[in-house]
UniProtKB/Swiss-Prot annotation:
It comes from Drosophila melanogaster (Fruit fly). Residues 1-23 form the signal peptide. The keyword Signal applies. Glycans are attached at residues 93, 156. This is L-dopachrome tautomerase yellow-f2. One of its GO terms (biological process) is indole-containing compound biosynthetic process.
């Protein structure tokens, strides 16, 4: 006969296994050792490539106009001198250098997965790309297609073309929004070759609907413009607002599409936390001082307003402000914002985050966790705290530095992990998989966590 102690232990073990079974980790969709393109820009096309051929004329540079003093503490946008010296050997006219292509953003919309490739080194054929899931979805390491076409990605062919894009966003009107930083972030040779700009593309026609150059009076350079969040209701597409965090200058920019105007908010909550800037990721130990990095919009309230949740990357705190405050241009000129900007609380130790996104179907915000190499979650109906902050997945081997997180219209979370600290401070091993894209339904990702 089985002893009571054995039965109790068996029951506990079974409950633990059931709890583990309820949890649904992120699913690896794609992985790459090095990135490749259908059109590398060298005149040699892979299957499915276009016959566009780039011009290699020198870019137009504004010498010294946007220069900044060297920073003693670095952001994620800086490169150490020891690493910069290795990049000096790159051919400045090379159209494609495989090692230099590090993907940053991933956004899905109806069978197309948009993947960005910021120009932090030479040899990047196209900064804005996509994967056709119907055609290439079965390939675990698919090549990228330039979007909306290869020609528009050739910054040195026209002053109207794309320079460098970090992340994208799809709005309720089926439009793709992104910031072109206008900057070539080459080691020891950072160049602001044109003004940073906001772009809007119609995903039904792939036509550019709008390009807005950010004036120098608002943002001196595009160096800190790494993401964009769009606030618009379906059926009111002309009345869109875009919220753009500046991680370098620690500001929040608001662009109004209808009036074609942009304004800038400043607040202490946009600064990095000096106690949260020491990081250890992928075997690299370093210090970053990235300020406000990500903004996500919560559920619509009875009065029609929405909360805008935000955080600096070098911080474990979450903050909030009403979108009504941001949309009033006159508020940006105030010297004191009173209690309009609020501290919600800390997510807990080692929860520094790049991007986060709110899922309306579950009421949960999901976070990229760079220290934990994973994805976290918080149910917005609960107070934010370490106890109410959950872990969806964590993988120190395969999910090194999750750089982007977005949720599509079907409630699927998409995450990019790109080993960026290893690329910046050491050397990527090109014999192993360095870049991955993951996905999971938000309704499943929260199972078995405190975010239920």
């Amino acid at each position: 006969m089985l002893s009571p102690q054995f039965l109790i232990l068996s029951l506990i073990s079974g409950l633990q296994l059931l709890s583990l079974a309820d949890a649904d980790p992120m699913i690896e969709v794609f992985r790459w050792k090095q990135m490749d393109f259908y059109n590398r820009g060298d005149g040699h096309l892979s299957s499915g490539g276009r016959k566009d051929r780039p011009s290699f004329s020198a870019p137009v540079v504004f010498p010294g106009k946007y220069s900044r003093r060297k920073r003693k503490i670095m952001t994620s946008r800086d490169t150490p001198v020891v690493v910069s010296s290795r990049a000096d050997s790159d051919d400045p006219n090379a159209s494609y250098i495989p090692y230099n292509n590090v993907p940053m953003g991933a956004t899905h919309f109806r069978g197309r997965l948009f993947v960005t490739m910021p120009r932090r080194r030479v040899g990047i054929p196209s900064t804005l790309n996509y994967i056709d899931l119907a055609e290439d979805g079965s390939n675990r390491s698919p090549k990228l297609r330039a979007y909306p076409n290869f020609a528009l990605n050739q910054f040195n062919a026209s002053a109207e073309n794309l320079v460098s894009v970090y992340r994208t966003s799809v709005d309720a009107c089926q439009r793709l929004w992104f910031i072109d930083t206008g900057m070539l972030e080459y080691p020891n040779n950072r160049q602001q070759i044109r003004r940073p700009s906001i772009w809007v593309v119609d995903l039904a026609t792939d036509q550019v609907l709008k390009r807005f150059d950010v004036p120098e009076s608002i943002a001196e350079t595009g160096r800190g413009l790494a993401s964009i969040t769009v606030d618009v209701k379906a059926g009111q597409c002309g009345d869109a607002y875009a919220y753009i965090p500046d991680l370098v200058y620690r500001r929040l920019y608001v662009y109004h599409l209808r009036n074609d105007r942009i304004w800038s908010f400043e607040h202490n909550y946009f600064n990095f936390d000096p106690l949260s800037g020491d990081l250890s990721i992928g075997g690299q130990t370093f210090r970053w001082d990235d300020g406000i990095f990500s903004i996500t919009l919560g559920a619509q309230k009875l009065d029609g307003s929405r909360d805008a949740y935000f955080h600096p990357m070098a911080s474990t705190n979450e903050f909030v402000v009403s979108n009504r405050v941001l949309q009033q241009e006159s508020n940006a000129a105030r010297s004191d914002h009173g209690n309009d900007f609020r501290v919600l609380g800390s997510r807990g130790p080692s929860t520094q985050s790049t991007m986060h996104a709110y899922d309306p179907g579950t009421g949960v915000i999901f976070f990229d966790e760079i220290q934990r190499n994973g994805v976290g979650c918080w149910k917005t109906s609960k107070p934010i705290s370490a106890e109410n902050y959950g872990s969806v997945d964590s993988n120190a081997e395969d999910m090194i530095y999750p750089s982007d997180l977005s949720i599509d219209e079907d409630g699927t979370i998409w995450v990019m992990s790109n080993s960026m600290p290893i690329f910046i401070y050491s050397t990527l091993d090109t014999s192993i998989y360095n870049f991955r894209i993951w996905k999971q339904k938000a309704s499943l990702a929260k199972r078995g966590t405190v975010c239920e």
